[in-house]
Every structure is written in C-alpha cells, then in structure tokens.
Amino acid sequence: MNMHSPNEPDAPEVMTTPQPGTAAVTPMMEQFIEIKAANPDSLLFYRMGDFYELFFDDAEKASRALGIVLTKRGKHQGHDIPMCGVPVHAADDYLQKLIGQGFRVAVCEQIEDPAEAKKRGSKSVVRRDVVRLVTPGTITEDKLLAPSESSFLMALGRVKGGSDHSFAIAWIDISTGAFRVAETTADRLLADIFRVDPRELIVAEPVFHDPELRPVFDVLGRVANPQPPSLFDSASATGRIARFFDVATPDSFGTFSRAELSAISGAIAYVEKTQKAERPPLSRPEREEQGSTLFIDPATRGNLELLRTLSGSREGSLFKAIDRTVTGGGARLLADRLMAPLTDPAAIGARLDSVSFFRTETRLCQAVRASLKSVADMPRALSRLALNRGGPRDLGALRAGFEAAGAIVEIFAATALPQELAEAMAAIRALPQALAQHLIQALGEELPLLKRDGGFLRGGYHPELDEMRALRDESRKVIAGLERSLIEETGIRSLKIRHNNVLGYYIEVTANHHAIMTGSDGAKARFIHRQTMANAMRFTTTELAELETKIANAADRALGIELAAFEALTAQAVGEAEKIRAGADALAAIDVSAALALLSESEAWCRPVVDSSLAFEISGGRHPVVEQALRRSGEGPFVANDCDLSPEGNAKNGAIWLLTGPNMGGKSTFLRQNALIAILAQTGSFVPATSAHIGVVDRLFSRVGASDDLARGRSTFMVEMVETAAILNQAGERALVILDEIGRGTATFDGLSIAWAAVEYLHEKNRCRAIFATHFHEMTSLAGKLARLHNVTMRVKEWEGDVVFLHEVGKGAADRSYGVQVARLAGLPEAVVDRAKQVLHQLEEGEVSGKTNRLVDDLPLFSVAMKREAPKPVKSDALGAALGDINPDEMTPREALEALYRLKGLAGK
C-alpha cells in the first residue's frame, strides 16, 4: 500500500484546461475540453490515430511523470497549447508509470470511424468518449499486475445510528473477481485497512473530511480517494446489487448490515463508474465475521515485516522466506492468509491437516506440484475476457488450467483426502467440462497476444475457416488446381488462368480454340466471354468469379470467423465464471498446502498444536527469515530457543517474560520469532520449532524498533508511547504482546518508571501473554512481586575482557548490558572506549546523581578529545595485516565477533 503523494517537482505555472464554451479553439480541441471537463480528476488519454494525446496541464504533468517530450498543438488565447503523447501499442507501460505515481487516467477512444464522421458533414469530428477510468484499484492488465500480489479496491461505508457511527469495509479484486465485506469499528478501521492492503480506498466525501477520521486518511495518503456520497447510499444498495448481479433480489447473498450495504454499494458503483459499459465477473460478496481473524495493528505489521520489509521490499520479508508456491493464485492466497491468520482452532486444524497430508504423501505432493506448474492465472484471464481486454492467450490460460485440473483429478483418483483437500477436489471436479473440451478442440498450440492477429484456432476445428485459410495461404495452388480441371474438361492443353488488375482472374485460350468455348449453348452458359484479343480470347466462369471473390475476401473472412469464435468462447467462459473461479481458488489452496508441506520438510518445521487454551509453549523455536539468511551467508546455524508463556499451576492467565541481556545478544530476534511462530501457526502452517503448543491468539501487538514521524511532529519517543498506549488499552487475556526497550527514548529514570508501570499494567490489567525486553535491570526485582512474571536473559560469556554472545535464552537476569564491549566491536576510538569504562565504573559505584560532578572534574571531555594515543605494539606482521583488512563500518555484528576471535588467535602466536 503506497501511502505517499505523487512526487511532482516544483514546476512553472501551467496552462490549465479551459472550461467548455470559453475558448476559441478547433472542433477537435473543443471536444477534448468537453470530455476533460467530465473527468477533471484524471489525466485524459485522448485517442488520435495510433497515439493517445494529452493537452494543457495534463500534458505538462504527464511529460514530467513519464519523462517524455512536451510539444505543442495550436493556440489558446495567444499561447501555445502544451501537448504530449504515447503510442497506443505501448500504453500499458506508460499507464503503469502513471498509476505508480498516484495518477488516475481516463482512456478516451474513437467510437466511430472517420468514414462515419464524414457522413455527418465534412467538418464533423470523429466521436470519442471515455471507455474506462484506470485507477490503482481497478487494474486488470497483466503487465500492470504482480502475479503474487492481490490488487484490492476497498470501499468504506459509514451509517449513523443515533450519536454513534457504524462502519464496514468491502474490498474487491477486479482482476480475480474476489469480493468480501466486513463490519469494523473506528478504532479497528486502520488495522483492518492495513490487513487488506488495498491499492485504493474510496470513501464518501463527508466521511473523508470528518475531523475524527482525518488521522486515518492522513496515514493512508493518496490511497484514499473521496467520492460523491450517492455511491454509498445504503437505501438504494439493494437495487444496485440486484442490477449488477442480474438477480431479482440479493436476499440469497446473505444478511448485511446497513454499513455493509453502504460499503458494497460504493464498491459496485465505483466499478461501474470506472469500467463504463463493461462488467467484471465479480463473485457474490462474502461476509467475514468480526473476530474470525487475528487482529494485528499497523505498527505490528510493519515491525514484523510480514509481506514487505520496512524499506518496502519483498526480499527479507516473512512471505519471501516461506513462499514455495508455483502458481500466481497460490502466492496471492498465501499472502492473504499471512495477513489474516485465523482464530478458529477447527479451521486452523483443517488447513494443517492438508499440509500434513502432503508432508506424508511426498510422491503425491511432487506430482501435484508438477501439474500445478502448468496452471496459468485463470481468474485474471477470465476477468480480462469479461472486460473485453482479453486475447487468445487468456483463453489459453483457461485451457491450461482445465488440463492441469484434469491431471490432478487423476492423481487423487483413489486417495482418501482430508476435509479441505476433499472440498477443493469437489470444486475442481465441478469445472465446466464442456468448455474445457471446447477450448482444447478449438485453440492451437502457439497463440498470438492479440485476437486481431488471428491464427489462434486449430486446423480442422472450423471447415469454412480451413477453406478460407487455404484460399488465403495457398491461392496459387487453388488456381492451379482449377486450371488443371478446366484443361481436362475442355481438352485445351494451352488453357491458362491469368490475372490482371482490370479483369481480375480470367481464363485465356488461343483464338483457334474459340469454338470449344462458344460452340454450343452449354459452352456459352458455362464460359462467359470477357475480352477478345488478336490471338486469344478471355473468359470467366461462375466458379472462377466465386473463387476470385473468395480469394479476395479470404483473409478478412478468416479473421472474421476467428473473431466470432473468440467471442463465442469468451461468452461461454464468462457464463461459467462462478465455477471457474471456484476451481481456480481450489487449485490455489492445493498449491499453498503442497508448498507449505515442502517448506516444512526442507526447513525441519513441526506441526503446531493450536487449541482454545492460553498455552504458548515453543521448544526449539527459530526465526524463519534470519535462519535462512544465516544459511545463505554461511555464518553458521541459527541458535534455537524455547519460550513458555503458558499459565502455570492453577493460574488462569499466561505468563510474562522479562527479558534482559546485552545489545547484540539477540533479544529483538527472539521477540519477533515468537510472534511470527504464532502467526504461522494460525495461518495453518507448520512452524520453525521442534514442537509448539499455542492457544489461539486473538490480538497480536509488537513494539519492536521505532522511528520519527516528522510529518506529524512526533519524535521517536512519542511514536513509541503512542504504540505502547494502544497496546495497553486494547490487549486482552488472549493477546500476545512483545515489547522491546520501552522507555529508552527519554531520561533514564523517566524511562524506567514508564517501563516499570507498563509491566505492572500488563500483569494486573491486561493479563495477557507477553515478552518484555529491557535494559533496565532494576526491573528484574518485579519477579518477586508479580506472580506470573519470570526473569529470562540472553546468555553471554566473558573471556579476557571481551564478551561472546551465545544467543541463548536462559532463566535469570542480566546485570550488565555490555554496551562498552559492543562499542569497541563497532570501532569506537580506544580513548572513547577507555573513558567509557571509567565513567561506567564510577557510575556503578554509587548513585548517578552523586557522581556526575566528580566525573566531570576527574577527566573533562576535552582532555579525552585532545589526548594522543600511544601506538600499541603489534605482536606480529600477520596481526597487523589482519587489522588492516578490517573495515568495521561494513561488518555485521557476527562478522565483527568472528574477526575478534581471529585477532585473538593471531595475538596469541
């Protein structure tokens, strides 16, 4: 979800598009102005021949955004009219750039040809109209879509109920037909939006300008798109839904609240507004119950890097680490599941059963994945066909999907399947076999991109088409065959069939054979005289005239037959949209289960126990992303750790672990890995551990890492406090909370006080399962006061004044953070490190406040800065060379530690 505004550099004042009737311009430009006035918020792609042209301020904006030449066409009020253009055949590439920068584009096509325009008058302008609005949430073109990412359009509905408001969201992926709706609340709204991760959010203008919701839309930036409130009218929603889905009443769709109807109405109305006359094959809106998915707030999603890292890249994310799917639909389903883990243990168990099946049946898993690799993106192909943007390859995608589905049916023919896989196979068996056979029979092997190119129907499928192709491609052979036939019929060995631009095709015989051609009434009827020459006579026949017409029209007729067949196949496919979509969803579910099974086997993951208890017991847990990164870099194995937050004895609530330990010891990794294990388990995946027992988590909160929010005037500490406040105000006993270094962004005693109070509140009020990492070692005394609080620490070893990080979690509390040692590893000057040791020693001897003055007097800062360090003796040339090779600015903590060991070894020689 790109939340930034279009980055338009400062530019000189532009020539804005005038209002209709206010400018003395050409008829063509007047037409542009009128159409632009109806689409003021979009760049207007105005079709002129083989180009889409843009004028006035649209041209200046597009020129900067696309990096194309700005030129001019005509004048307005004495000034040149700016113009730029893009070729029609490359329009998708330019649309991708514009949409990516936050623009919306109105595509204006010619809706009549020039000949028709001339019939209306010599000066008539060809009729044009907008056929489509291209927006971030309504893209269907393959070039503009990432195969593994959904492209959701979301609509926000709000209705008033007394003094309160109720909210709902509806989200559609036009490219696949997916359509869901759910109620939400004002405090959950932003979290639900981030869960769906829409490309575009439409909202009624009064709601968009509501001061109470302003913070939400400020966060979303250009993703939010205000629309007229009439689109969201819940009173007329029922009729709009019925018309769109062509049903008498939508009662069979289920019962929806007024807010849900408002959101559904807004989504459908916007689809109609942007797609004009075309209608995408949307599924019926599926209602999602509140609480059916794990609540994860936006900050936690960002901290855990589920789909993307904090820098916006998929590399390094959890999704990238676990994705082993082989289909676009499977990858999208896996991403959707990661963003919305389940809270129903039975539903989670059904998913895990499917993964377990493939984990056990490895040969079946391999065979199924081999078949799935040939599955193209059926839902997206179907959507393009329905919107009249498809081509032969989209029909080919459906054919490939049907063929793979048939192979998978054969693979599972005599196999008992778990519930989820059995339901998936039922949907696959229900795929329309008549359409499948029709596509297999009709389509050739090599398919063109565009239907207008022809050549996509298989030979033998349509007899007339075969004849037309023969005439088109083998006209000489056909003429030669007719010539031989006429020679045999007349006995004139010198008879020839020739062609010129005046007569077309004709039969030519020498003059002395004219009697054969004209000597009888039958011959006269058969051979029609066309021309007499000095030594020859020319004739035609009805057969030759028909053949000539056929040859002349063969190419057009061949293409016409193929286009008609394309439309018929498309109509048949769109008519089966519901079954095709269900079958494609089933193939995606099978892909996800098989992929997770492969992942669990290759990574040695275990099946978690997920139930309704409050358990949280992980043995040998690992961080899935970090573990793979260590393996790739060859830095050694990941150190697994246990975590047990389960209620103890007669306790009704889960435990809190107070985690202390040094910087670089692995605290943040440990925190994140347990949150990720919970997410993976409730997604229905095996988890990176030797065993795991997790009582369903209903809310997950993570406050790990922070950054400034300068745009809203919030410091790092303020951001930290806002996020911590949200956790303390919302977490219940089923929540899992991971907190890292609360209170570090302010004065020591202030920070300690806040962290101390937060732990007490989590224990006494929230009563949730939690891991709280801190450098405030004074807090470890809370373990004697709070019954469910336990001290754990990241273990280290000290050796000859240096520290070795073991990355192991054990019982107990740390009394030091080893910050000075880490500073040395980072390459701080030796004088700074030595002075830090002195300051630390004196601070640790007594109260800080009683020592600071003496510290300043003992060794002023400038004394350290000006002191020249005596060079230290180097024990060997090897040690000096090794030191010279080290660049501490480019080393990871682990690399620094390994370098330290090497230097120690050299120093001892």
From Swiss-Prot:
Single Gene Ontology BP annotation: mismatch repair
| Compositional bias of kind Basic and acidic residues | 275-290
Report the sequence similarity comment from the record. Answer: Belongs to the DNA mismatch repair MutS family.
Q: What does this protein do?
A: This protein is involved in the repair of mismatches in DNA. It is possible that it carries out the mismatch recognition step. This protein has a weak ATPase activity.
Q: Which Pfam families match?
A: MutS_I, MutS_II, MutS_III, MutS_IV, MutS_V
What NCBIfam families does this protein's entry cite?
mutS1, PRK05399.1
Q: Which GO terms describe its cellular component?
A: cytosol
Keywords in alphabetical order, please.
Answer: ATP-binding, DNA damage, DNA repair, DNA-binding, Nucleotide-binding
Presence of the UniProt keyword DNA repair in the record? yes
Name the positions where ATP binds: G661, P662, N663, M664, G665, G666, K667, S668
SUPFAM superfamilies reported for this sequence: DNA repair protein MutS, domain I, DNA repair protein MutS, domain II, DNA repair protein MutS, domain III, P-loop containing nucleoside triphosphate hydrolases
PANTHER family membership? DNA MISMATCH REPAIR PROTEIN MSH1, MITOCHONDRIAL, DNA MISMATCH REPAIR PROTEIN MUTS FAMILY MEMBER
Name of the protein in question: DNA mismatch repair protein MutS
Gene3D superfamilies to which the protein is assigned, alphabetical: 1.10.1420.10, 6.10.140.430, DNA repair protein MutS, domain I, MutS, connector domain, P-loop containing nucleotide triphosphate hydrolases
The record's GO molecular-function terms, alphabetically, read: ATP binding; ATP-dependent DNA damage sensor activity; damaged DNA binding; mismatched DNA binding
Superkingdom per UniProt? Bacteria
Keyword rRNA processing carried by entry = no
Region Disordered: which residues? 275-295
